[in-house]
């Protein structure tokens, strides 16, 4: 592949931007993965890796996870804040606290803990807190407790504090403080408290409701004052050590971040004036990732990088401290998405392709209905030299004629053969118009989009959108999707991807297409009998956890991939994936009972004993097989 072709391919899929140096296209036109861009010689051909794994029995779909990417992301964020602190002369520390709700899998938590980097952990529920406390002995850093809290949750956090961990119980509802003080006295432990302030500042986009004045969590200004007085009266004002706020997830615009940090810095200043010795400034989440690769303010992109993000936070807090003669607090960020998104790729196979194949029909008979003759006349005019009608007009005329024919077919005016003839001619017209369109002509752009969607291949992919990419369905989030090979060719085809659930919502609606977003995916030419494998990238944040059981499709297999500078690769199976029996048990259908019921039915048939046994064995094998489609 020439450098010019490679550059064009990278621009088509924006790999250079969302790939963030972890993903690239190699000289074979395959996706390659470099888990640590600081060690560029440690890379693997993902297409070849998947084929090797398949030959060894790997089932698709499967998650290919790269723990080394997690560790590099953590190092990169820590390094950005180190540079920002040095640049400003900031005296406080910095900790990244990983909110495990983003991805609670053991491989994620332990990969981050074993990275050698400073790291804290955040919990938002009792179950998460138990996981965090169990791992806390490996990290000896900071634990932040968010979310709704009952007495058991609060006791667990205080037990962690009594064990020697630095556990911050963040007060998000006024009702929590009485329980905290009561249980702290019972356990004879000094609580370490935080307060979540509800800001007026708010981000924009799909996740904006998680921040701002209408946020589900946090205390309003009046409630913050009430909390301070309650603690003062209880003689526990010194326990309030952390200020927390959250602007929203996936903040696209750096200006929104800067505005929110400045507002929260005022809370820090005012709390100090009230005698509260705040030591930690937790800015929460919000550090976004560029799913689109457009470097813009759109919902699934960001217009800033790690350095700019860190600089805006450190300088805003530092300036507020300097102006008011206050100490520089320890800065905490809860950057879960930015740590985990890149490290996981869902790989699956295409199980079927439906192309809009067509043949130009012969001319209609002389006494054919007027609509058929009109379509044919338009077709002939399209091939006459010097015609003055526009491409758009030809397309509109043919669409109106086809619409009349469809209505006429429903009323019995047109036969099935006539409808098929009209549809074939219409496809021929679309193809002819498509050839004459110029992507550089702005007037042609809407027609190009319309025809690309109309003529796109339908690719049926062996996965469940609801299980593996629920945010693509629930909030129209865009994820990078592209073939793992064939990227040394110009993407001359278009496709739409459909999953294997029995739900029309099981389709991907938005795809990266250069600097824009399209409703069809650019595809290089391929053999429909042997289509390429597809990679769904940046699914490491939230998707595994939010996935649901629609049609009883379960968790996919998952492998952890480690790549070394000498070119060697180690692959470990981290999740065998759900079986049919696993999924049935989730809905209280006992596999053994089902097998017994099926056996009873088979025995009542007139089938011979050998066939009965064969059917029973097939049923039982299916119960303990993969929930996704499997080749023979």
From Swiss-Prot:
Residues that hold substrate according to the record: 281-291
Please give the cofactor(s) recorded in the UniProt entry for this protein: Mg(2+); pyridoxal 5'-phosphate
Keywords per UniProt: Decarboxylase, Lyase, Magnesium, Metal-binding, Polyamine biosynthesis, Putrescine biosynthesis, Pyridoxal phosphate, Spermidine biosynthesis
Q: Pfam families from the xrefs?
A: Arg_decarb_HB (PF17810), Arg_decarbox_C (PF17944), Orn_Arg_deC_N (PF02784)
Which pathway is recorded for this entry? Amine and polyamine biosynthesis; agmatine biosynthesis; agmatine from L-arginine: step 1/1
EC number(s): the record gives: 4.1.1.19
Q: Which residues carry this modification: N6-(pyridoxal phosphate)lysine?
A: 101
| InterPro entries xrefs | Ala_racemase/Decarboxylase_C, Arg_decarb_HB, Arg_decarbox_C, Arg_decrbxlase, De-COase2_CS, De-COase2_N, De-COase2_pyr-phos_BS, Orn/DAP/Arg_de-COase
- What broad class of enzyme is this? lyase
What role does it play? Catalyzes the biosynthesis of agmatine from arginine.
What's this protein's family per the entry?
Belongs to the Orn/Lys/Arg decarboxylase class-II family. SpeA subfamily.
What name has this protein been given in UniProt? Answer: Biosynthetic arginine decarboxylase
């Amino acid at each position: 592949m020439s450098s010019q072709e490679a550059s064009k391919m990278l621009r088509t899929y924006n790999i250079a931007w969302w790939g963030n140096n972890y993903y690239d296209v190699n000289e074979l036109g395959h996706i390659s993965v470099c888990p640590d861009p600081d060690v560029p010689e440690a890379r693997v051909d993902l297409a070849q890796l998947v084929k090797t794994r398949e030959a060894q029995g790997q089932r698709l779909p499967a998650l290919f996870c790269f723990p080394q990417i997690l560790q590099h992301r953590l190092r990169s964020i820590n390094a950005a804040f180190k540079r920002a602190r040095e640049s400003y002369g900031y005296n406080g520390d910095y900790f990244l606290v990983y909110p495990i709700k983003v991805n609670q899998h053991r491989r994620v938590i332990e990969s981050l803990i074993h990275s050698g980097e400073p790291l804290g952990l955040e919990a938002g529920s009792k179950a998460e807190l138990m996981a965090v406390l169990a791992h806390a002995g490996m990290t000896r850093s900071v634990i932040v407790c968010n979310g709704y809290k009952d007495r058991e949750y609060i006791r667990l956090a205080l037990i962690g504090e009594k064990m020697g961990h630095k556990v911050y119980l963040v007060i998000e509802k006024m009702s929590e403080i009485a329980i905290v003080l009561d249980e702290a006295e019972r356990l004879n432990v000094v609580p370490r408290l935080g307060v979540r302030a509800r800001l007026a500042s708010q981000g924009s986009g799909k996740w904006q409701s998680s921040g701002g004045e209408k946020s589900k969590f946090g205390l309003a200004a009046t409630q913050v004052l009430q909390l301070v007085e309650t603690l003062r009266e209880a003689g526990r004002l010194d326990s309030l050590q952390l200020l927390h706020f959250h602007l929203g997830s996936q903040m696209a615009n750096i200006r929104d971040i800067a505005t929110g940090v400045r507002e929260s810095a005022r809370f820090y200043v005012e709390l100090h004036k009230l005698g509260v010795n705040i030591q930690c400034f937790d800015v929460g989440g919000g550090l976004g990732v560029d799913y689109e690769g457009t470097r813009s303010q759109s919902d699934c992109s960001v217009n800033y990088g790690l350095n700019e993000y860190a600089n805006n936070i450190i300088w805003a807090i530092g300036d507020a401290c300097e102006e008011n003669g206050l100490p520089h607090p320890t800065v905490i960020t809860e950057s879960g998405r930015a740590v985990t998104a890149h490290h996981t790729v869902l790989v699956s196979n295409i199980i079927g392709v439906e192309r809009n194949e067509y043949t130009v029909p012969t001319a209609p008979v002389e006494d054919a209905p007027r609509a058929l003759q009109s379509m044919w006349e338009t077709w002939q005019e399209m091939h006459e030299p010097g015609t003055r009608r526009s491409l758009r007009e030809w397309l509109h005329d043919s669409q109106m004629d086809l619409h009349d024919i469809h209505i006429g077919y429903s009323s019995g005016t047109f036969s099935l053969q006539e409808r098929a003839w009209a549809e074939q001619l219409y496809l021929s017209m679309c193809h002819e118009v498509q050839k004459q369109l110029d992507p550089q002509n702005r007037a042609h752009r809407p027609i190009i989009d319309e025809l690309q969607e109309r003529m796109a291949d339908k690719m049926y992919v062996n996965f469940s959108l609801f299980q593996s990419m629920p945010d693509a369905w629930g909030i129209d989030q865009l994820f990078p999707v592209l073939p793992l090979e064939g990227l040394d060719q110009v993407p001359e085809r278009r496709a739409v991807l459909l999953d294997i659930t029995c739900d029309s919502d099981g389709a991907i609606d938005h795809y990266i297409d250069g600097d824009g977003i399209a409703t069809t995916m650019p595809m290089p030419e391929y053999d429909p009998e042997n289509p390429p494998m597809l990679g769904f990238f940046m699914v490491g944040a939230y998707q595994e956890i939010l996935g649901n059981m629609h049609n009883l499709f379960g968790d996919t297999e998952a492998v952890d991939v480690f790549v070394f500078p000498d070119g060697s690769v180690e692959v470990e199976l981290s999740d065998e994936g759900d079986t049919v029996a696993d999924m049935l048990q989730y809905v209280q259908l006992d596999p053994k009972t089902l097998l017994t019921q099926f056996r009873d039915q088979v025995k009542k048939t007139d089938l011979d004993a050998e066939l009965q046994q064969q059917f029973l064995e097939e049923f039982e094998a299916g119960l303990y097989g993969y929930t996704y489609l499997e080749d023979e």
